[in-house]
Design a protein with these regions (language model features):
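Hydrophobic alpha-helical membrane-interaction elements
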Residues: 20-46
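Metal-dependent active-site segment of extracytoplasmic phospho-/sulfohydrolases and closely related
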Residues: 462-503, 580-588, 594-596, 604-606, ...
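Active-site-proximal N-terminal segment of extracellular/periplasmic enzymes that hydrolyze or transfer
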Residues: 56-106, 115, 191, 195, ...
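N-terminal secretory/membrane targeting signals
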Residues: 1-18
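Short, structured active-site-proximal loop/turn typified by the sulfatase FGly-forming signature C/S-X-P-X-R
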Residues: 85-135, 139, 197, 510-511
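His/Asp/Glu-rich, glycine-adjacent segments
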Residues: 128-449, 530-580, 614
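Substrate-binding rim/cap in mid-to-C-terminal beta-strand-loop elements of soluble/periplasmic
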Residues: 503-555, 630-673
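Polar, surface-exposed loop/tail segments
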Residues: 207-210, 492, 557, 562-564, ...
Length: 698
């Protein structure tokens, strides 16, 4: 789904050019020169310190001269649904959010089209729609190859390399490029002298420089270059067993110990780039414990508990290493040993790729608060979906990640006397995805599974979020602004729709002779006879001549074809369920106008609640039924008609929340600090004329 493992490894091997440089003499001379320059600069800094303090103070006073607030603290609760939130507030189960509602503002927040986290959070930060920030889905397609790419970032290897025997040395650094367009509001604030701390907001990788601190969120890859690949180890002989989202590795018993190898990133210094592997052994003990020995570390594992984050160093070639971190989870010791390792996260203390701005910020957080997850999608939903983790161990993982994020937020708020702090929490989203089936006894995902024990998981995640809001609110003063919001709501995901299967059945998509349609990423498609195809979680593209590599649809015929598809897909009937699977189909050019509209899907499918793109369709397969049951634990979703999944908006100030949209938040924050709205922003400020704060502090 994400950048390739090889490309990521190039980043971890970036210092390789130093090993074929001019030599040690240059390095020694350079060090002496650096020392002289450092002494000179140190004296200059000391002499000019009083003047710089006066100038900085003057600039700060000017920056806040028009501000209506000392601090703005934004808490993002990904996926918090207004129906559930309102029901729980009515029952008295979320008192802190109720207090915000009663003394300040509460309203439903219009999400984006489509209602996906990368799209919505991009609109949150830029104040613009997809046509202006260029993010339309988790995935975009490459019109040259028809293959999917990560929509938010591009990682390319260095242009030059040097091969010496079986080794390949990379000359230079990989190219990292953020694909989101338009400027985030914190960069605008920074240009006006207002400092921001931004924590784990989606679509902030790679970090862009601005006047502030940032730790990147969703779409940060793991050390293998994927969006999260777990490893499951077992002594059981399960030849041929495969997992989506992870790898199964056989453990070997050897005279009382168990040996295994943890697969890591590709060894980019070697021809053919095999994966680096880190050997380890497990010594079973008594009372449900075992000793893990890996990378020179000895750690006691307890059955049913996660280890701390362990640093791991992988040899990639001569002079090249990449450091990552992972947690280990001992599932069982008998009759077979089963051991789970989280995806190998980039080590925040020795990041193989830039994950923060400035780069030292990730190191500071780790030294100050302890090592933490850096993977964008840190909650391992695939491990639960595949049955590698059970519900209890997944929830424990979510709890650990929530606590890490909370420590970061409390640290940032405590260090910020004036300015903006933004932090997004993912737990509400991940728990609803994986536990929605417990709300519906007849959900197809409950077949053959226990369906009662975790019925309160979603409400407990909401209560946890409410408690967080209370802790942050109690730390704020009367001159501070607190905003709590979600990017979208949630609905059940009972049935999956394969739009490509429908396009094939209705003559818009054709397969190559002899192909079955089972191939992933549309590899079975005959592009010379295909007029439309679907990629991602709701996007439909026309195969336009001159835009796609093998396009056949003349541009002048595209509007008519779009309208034909809109009419035929709208109200698509689910024969088995006896209802419509599709509410509406949107013309992207109409709902998301802007300079980047043509790079996104031509149409966006707005599914009815209970439906979503099927799992096969999400992998680019054409074969199979048009509509089928969703039997996976991932049983809730939000990739539906955006009108069905608004988010929530709370604030301790009185805001004009009538028809409030996700893209209105950025202009609102700017106006709180007295900064005008840039022309590229489509949103409006929600500040009420009085602008009075109204939060009664705990």
């Amino acid at each position: 789904m994400a950048a390739s493992a090889a490309a990521l490894l190039l980043a971890s091997a970036a210092p390789a050019h130093a090993y074929i440089g001019p030599g040690a003499g240059f390095a020694v001379f350079g060090s002496f020169l650096v020392m002289l320059v450092a002494l000179f600069l140190g004296g200059f800094v000391l002499l000019t310190w009083p003047v710089r303090v006066l100038i900085r103070g003057h600039r700060r006073r000017r920056a806040y001269a028009r501000s209506q607030t000392d601090r703005v603290v934004v808490i993002g609760l990904d996926g918090m649904d207004p129906d559930i939130a309102e029901s729980m507030m009515a029952a008295g189960r979320m008192p802190h959010l109720s207090k915000l509602r009663d003394s300040g503002t509460y309203g439903r927040l219009e999400t984006t089209c489509p209602p996906m986290s990368p799209v919505a959070w991009s609109s949150f930060m830029t104040g613009a729609g997809p046509g202006r920030h260029g993010i339309f889905d988790f995935l975009h397609r490459d019109p040259r190859t028809y293959l999917p790419n990560l929509s938010s970032a591009q990682i390319r290897p260095p242009a030059r390399s040097l091969r010496v025997g079986r080794f390949r040395f990379l000359l230079g650094r990989p190219v990292l490029r953020a694909l989101r367009r338009s400027k985030p509001f914190w960069a605008v604030l920074g240009e006006h002298g207002i400092f921001s701390t931004v924590l784990r907001v989606p679509i902030t990788f790679p970090p862009e420089p601005f006047n502030g601190l940032l730790l990147a969120g969703m779409c940060v890859p793991d050390l293998r270059g994927t969006q999260g690949s777990f490893t499951f180890f077992t002594t059981a002989d399960e030849a041929g067993a495969r997992h989506i989202g992870g790898e199964r590795v056989h453990l070997v018993r050897d005279r009382g110990v168990v040996r295994g190898e943890l697969p890591g990133p590709a060894q980019s210094g070697l021809a053919g780039a095999p994966a680096a592997r880190l050997p380890f052994l497990v010594r079973p003990g008594g009372n449900g414990t075992a000793r893990l020995e890996v990378n020179g570390q000895r750690v006691i594992l307890r059955q049913g508990e996660y280890s701390d984050w362990l640093p791991l160093s992988f040899w990639l070639g001569p002079g090249m290493r990449a450091t990552g971190i992972c947690r280990w989870y001992l599932k069982q010791l008998e009759p077979e040993i089963e051991l789970y390792a989280t995806p190998i996260n980039i080590d925040p203390e020795r990041p193989a790729l830039p994950i923060s701005h400035p780069r030292i910020y990730s190191v500071y957080l780790s030294k100050r608060l302890g090592r933490y997850a850096t993977l964008g999608l840190a909650e391992d939903t695939w491990a639960l979906n595949e049955g590698v983790l059970d519900e209890a161990s997944f929830l424990r993982q979510c709890q650990l990640l929530f606590e890490e994020r909370e420590r970061m937020l409390l640290n940032a708020v405590g260090n910020t006397r004036r300015g903006c702090v933004v932090c997004v929490f993912d737990t509400t989203d991940r728990v609803q995805h994986m536990f929605w089936r417990y709300r519906e006894h007849d959900h197809p995902a409950n077949r053959g599974k226990e369906s009662a024990a975790f019925g309160a998981a979603i409400e407990e995640a909401y209560e946890q979020a409410n408690a967080l809001v209370g802790r942050i609110a109690s730390s704020l003063g009367s001159g501070d602004t607190l905003i709590v919001l979600s990017d979208h709501g949630f609905k059940s995901f009972r049935r999956g729709v394969n739009v490509n299967a429908w396009l094939k059945a209705n003559g818009y998509l054709a397969l190559r002779p002899g192909a079955t349609g089972d191939g992933e990423w549309l590899r079975d498609v005959d592009w010379g006879r295909t007029r439309a195809y679907a990629i991602g979680l709701g996007g439909v593209y026309l195969n336009i001549r001159g835009r796609e590599a093998q396009g056949i649809v003349p541009r002048e015929e595209a509007p008519a074809l779009k309208q034909e598809l809109i009419e035929r897909l709208t109200g698509l009937h689910d024969e088995e369920a006896g209802q419509a699977a599709v509410n509406r189909v949107f013309d992207s050019a109409a709902v998301s106008p802007g300079p980047y509209t043509d790079s996104g899907p031509d149409l966006a499918v707005g599914y009815a609640p209970g439906y979503r793109t099927s799992w096969d369709a999400a992998q680019g397969k054409v074969a199979g039924p048009v509509i089928e049951d969703n039997t996976r634990r991932w049983s809730g979703d939000h990739c539906v008609d955006p009108d069905c999944v608004p988010g929530v908006l709370f604030c301790n100030r009185h805001l004009d929340v009538a028809s409030a949209r996700m893209m209105d938040i950025a202009p609102t924050i700017l106006s709180l600090f007295g900064v005008g709205t840039p022309a590229y922003m489509e949103g409006r400020s929600l500040l009420a004329p009085t602008g009075e704060a109204g939060y009664a502090h705990a």
